[in-house]
Curated annotation (Swiss-Prot):
Official protein name in the record: GMP synthase [glutamine-hydrolyzing] subunit A
Glutamine amidotransferase type-1 domain mapped to chain residues: 2-181
Species per Swiss-Prot/TrEMBL record: Methanothrix thermoacetophila (strain DSM 6194 / JCM 14653 / NBRC 101360 / PT) (Methanosaeta thermophila)
Primary role: Catalyzes the synthesis of GMP from XMP.
GO-annotated cellular components: cytosol
EC number, as in UniProt: 6.3.5.2
Lineage, broadest ranks: Archaea, Methanobacteriati, Methanobacteriota, Stenosarchaea group, Methanomicrobia
Encoding gene (name): guaAA
Entry-linked Pfam families: GATase (PF00117)
Keyword terms, alphabetized: ATP-binding, Glutamine amidotransferase, GMP biosynthesis, Ligase, Nucleotide-binding, Purine biosynthesis
Molecular function per GO: ATP binding; GMP synthase activity
Catalytic residues, chain numbering: 72, 159, 161
Quaternary context: Heterodimer composed of a glutamine amidotransferase subunit (A) and a GMP-binding subunit (B).
Classification via Gene3D superfamilies: 3.40.50.880
Amino acid sequence: MKILVVNNYGQFNHLIYRSIKDRVEARMISNETPVEDIVADGLILGGGPSMDRSGRCSEYLRTLDIPVLGICLGLQIMAVTFGGKVEPGKVGGYASVEIEVLEEDGILRGVPHRFMAWASHADQVTICPPEFRVIARSSICDIEAICHESRPLYGVQWHPEVAHTEYGEEVFDNFLEICRR
C-alpha cells in the first residue's frame, strides 16, 4: 500500500509523513504534482498557511478516486472544493481543544466521545459542503471534522500528527484501514 502526503507548506507536514511512513510505504509530494502522476492507495492533504498556496489540491479531490484525509488546511480545501465555506475563526492560533465526536465511524472509529487535540482555528469551515456531514465539533468550532456521504473523503481541523493530540495514531490507523478496502 502506498500513501502520498501532499505538502501544503505547513509546519507539521513532515510529522504527518513520519507518522505514515512507519506504517506503510509513503512519500511526500508537492501540491503542484500533476494529477496524472499520482498513483497511490490514499492521499493526505497536509496543512499550510493559506488557501492561496494550495496548488492542485482541489483538482486531486475532484479527479482522483481514492481515499483522502484532509488535515487543517486540507479540510478547508475539501470543504471549499465541494461547496462549503471557510471563514476566519473566532479563536486564532494553536491551542488545545476538546473534540466532541458526533459519529464514531470511519476515521473516528474506536476514538472516545471526547478527547483533547492540538488545532489552529485562524480559519475554519463554517458551512459544511453538500453531500458531507459533520462528525466532530468543539466548543469553539461547530465543524471540527467532516466526511463525505458516499466517497471515502474525510477532513479534520485538528492535527492528529502532533504529540499534543490524543488518539491521533488511531485516526491515521483508521484512515489506512479505509485505504486498504
